[in-house]
């Protein structure tokens, strides 16, 4: 969420710091509406295979991929596929902060 805030601030877009709060702003969009710059949200805490709460965010970059600060890589920036076995099961929602 800090990475997303940094990138958005760089482009003059004000956004909350915490991913749960980021998921409340902008405009809710479906996965089929995703375009580069949209935010994608996940529940990365495994609670018996159920999605409970947003705990991670990335920036969609197109072609089914997103960029994010990976906790598995000690907060290094990584590009992942939304269709990966890990993230496809944990996807929760997407928000558009850029379109007016």
Locate each region found by the language model.
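Catalytic cysteine-centered active-site loop
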Residues: 1-36
């Amino acid at each position: 969420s800090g990475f997303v805030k940094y990138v958005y601030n760089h482009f003059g877009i004000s956004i909350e710091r915490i991913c749960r709060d980021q998921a409340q702003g902008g405009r809710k969009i479906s996965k089929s509406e995703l375009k580069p710059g949209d935010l994608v949200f996940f529940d990365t805490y495994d609670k018996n295979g159920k999605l409970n709460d947003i705990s991670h965010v990335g920036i969609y970059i197109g072609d089914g991929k997103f960029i994010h600060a990976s906790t598995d890589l000690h907060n290094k920036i990584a590009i992942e596929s939304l269709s990966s076995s890990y993230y496809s099961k944990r996807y929760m929602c997407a928000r558009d902060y850029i379109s007016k």
